[in-house]
């Protein structure tokens, strides 16, 4: 994948490409536990069972199958993601109904990124929340 992006073949798609193969395990999957243990959370900053109110704008880099988002405008490097930044993989959502059972935390440094942003772990993935009319994608 990295070679495809660097050769220009993946540019323009919403594909997320890992910045460095050292972030992968033996099966070539991202080794989240090694590089971003504790769900990428800073210990002591975790607030469970929180609610994101209607009207809030959240965003994420990645597919609709993910459950992690941030408040809109958290800088990319503060998200501590293992990917090359791809603006085509950026999605922004408006919360239409309050979302309960959210875990909010500060993002720990990971994948050689500084962290320090805020992350929301949602109770369901983006696809499900869209289907249930909790969120809608916005530009």
Task: Label each residue range with its predicted role.
Residues 2-139:
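Catalytic toxin/effector domains delivered as secreted proteins or via bacterial secretion systems
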């Amino acid at each position: 994948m990295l070679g495809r992006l660097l050769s220009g073949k993946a540019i323009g798609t919403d594909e997320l490409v890992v910045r460095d193969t050292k972030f992968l395990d033996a099966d070539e999957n991202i080794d989240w536990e090694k590089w971003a243990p504790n769900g990428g959370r800073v210990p002591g900053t975790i607030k469970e069972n929180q609610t994101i109110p209607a009207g809030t704008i959240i965003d994420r880099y990645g597919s609709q199958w993910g459950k992690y988002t941030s408040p809109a405008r958290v800088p990319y490097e503060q998200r501590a993601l293992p990917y090359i930044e791809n603006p085509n993989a950026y999605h922004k959502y408006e919360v239409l109904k309050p979302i309960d059972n959210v875990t909010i935390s500060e993002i720990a440094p990971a994948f050689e990124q500084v962290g320090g942003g805020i992350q929301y772990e949602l109770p369901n993935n983006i696809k499900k929340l869209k289907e249930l009319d909790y969120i809608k994608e916005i530009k």
